[in-house]
Amino acid sequence: MKTFVIGIGGVTNGGKTTLAKNLQKRLPNCSVISQDDFFKPESEIDIDENGFLQYDVLEALNMEKMMSAVSCWMENPGSSAGPAALESAQGVPILIIEGFLLFNYKPLDTIWNRSYFLTVPYEECKRRRSTRVYEPPDPPGYFDGHVWPMYLKHRQEMNSITWDIVYLDGTRSEEDLFSQVYEDVKQELEKQNGL
């Protein structure tokens, strides 16, 4: 069975989850897997020399468990969407995987039909992060001492990627971002279906 897998990566608080949920509402036969659902327990998270918990690294995530969820979906795509979705005009099962380190994890490299990466400038990212509540809470200096430097490091690693990633300005409106990605996905699905 044909499937269509979308990766939505990007900076923390860049709009990944919002975009994924908006797409899921409009795309038939669509499921979402969020990388944030696969964080290891706090007791298993490393602490750096500054005392910061190292959440913004692949080692903080149970990627094997996430890959298992992806594999389960691939083996039985569309099962979570229900029978009505399977009968839709665009019956290709769609999986959206969203997270901050998707494109830095090699086992996912060959899965993407479309890849998107949301960027947000430093000041806006810091402002957005300050409005969110995390468990455990961000200690003072965490954004500048860990979160942003890790984003820059992982973003630099992405320079070696050989497949196409569409970079999106995360400061654009939710509606604009949705419209751009939705239209792009529709065109790609039509190409895949030979329409």
Swiss-Prot record:
Know the name of this protein?
Answer: Nicotinamide riboside kinase 1
Q: Which Pfam family would be a valid example here?
A: AAA_18
Residue sites binding ATP per the record: 10-18, 128, 132-134, 172-174
**GO MF annotations, alphabetized:** ATP binding; metal ion binding; nicotinate riboside kinase activity; ribosylnicotinamide kinase activity; ribosylnicotinate kinase activity
Catalytic residues, chain numbering: 36 (proton acceptor)
Q: What class of enzyme is it?
A: transferase
Q: Which gene encodes it?
A: Nmrk1
- Respond yes or no to whether keyword Cytoplasm is given for this record: no
